[in-house]
Amino acid sequence: MRALGLPGLLSVGMAITGAGALEGHSLKHYSTTRQFHGEVRLAAKIEFGGGTLNVGAGAPGSLYAMQLAYDAERFQPVSRWESGTSTVTLGLASRDKGAVGVGGTTQNQVADVQFSPQADLNLSMAMGAAKSVVDLGGLRLSSLVVETGASQTEVRFSKRNAMRCTAAEFRAGVAELTVVGLGNSLCDRVSFEGGMGSVVLDYSGAWTADTKLDATLAMGGLTLRIPRAVGVTITTEQFLASFQPAGFTRQGNRYTSSNNATATRHLDISLTTSLGGVTVEWLD
C-alpha cells in the first residue's frame, strides 16, 4: 500500500532534551508511533544497548509506539520502518560500537515499547546490559526470538496468546532470564541456549496442545517449572549422574514422568548440558 504523505497517517518521531541532569549528563526524550491501518502482520526488531526496557501490548489503534529517555552522548534512537515488508526496528544503538558500558547515565535510560494486539507479531529482541520486562499477554505472537547479554530479563505470557506461535527462541549469555507462563504462549516449540547465568522456564498457563523444548546449557543453572498434570519426557545427550528429577523414571538417558501415559498434554524435552545444573519443579 502506498504511504500517504499526511503526518497523522505516518509514524511520528520527536526528541526533546530532558530537564534533569544526571551525573553531568541530561537525558533526552524521544517518541515515535505509527497508526494501525489494518496491517495483517508486523515483523518487529528491538535493539537495546543498556538501561531499562519495558515491552507490552499497546492501544489497538497504534501499530507500534516507543518512548525513550536516553543518554544522547553515547546512544542514539533507532526507528526504521520498511513499508514493503511491514518491518520495524526500534530501540537504542551505541554511538561507539566498541565501547558500550553501564556507567554514567546508561543505567538510567528507559525504553517503553508497545505493539498492536491486532496484527500478527513476529518479534525479535536483542538486549545488552539491560533490565527488561516483556509482557506478551494480549498480543498475537506468531514467533519470538530473545537474545540477552549481561542482563536481567523477565518475559511474561500473562494472558493466552491470541494465535498459534510456531517457535520461541531464547539465547542468554551471562544473564538472568525468567520466562513465565509458557503454557499461555501456544508455541509449538521452545528452544533455549544458555552460557553462564540463572534461567527459569515456567510452563504455567492454559495449555491447548503438546509442545517441545530444546535446551542447551553450558554453565549456570536451569530451572524447569512444569504443571503436575502435564506428561513430561526428558532426553539427555548423555547420562547425567547428578540429574535425578523427582517424579520420573529413567531408562538410560531418557526420563519419563509417572503420569506421562495418562496425561492429556505433553512436554517433550531435549536436554544438552556440560557443567550446568538442571532442576525440575512441579506446579500444583
What are these regions (language model features)?
Residues L22-H37, A59, Y64-T105, V155-D284:
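Short, surface-exposed interaction patches in beta-rich subdomains
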Residues K45-E47, L123-M127, V134-D135, D214-T216, ...:
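A structural feature that tracks compact, well-ordered secondary-structure segments
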Residues W81-T87, S94, D112-V113, A119-L123, ...:
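Pepsin/retropepsin-fold aspartyl endopeptidases
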Residues S124-M163:
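Right-handed parallel beta-helix
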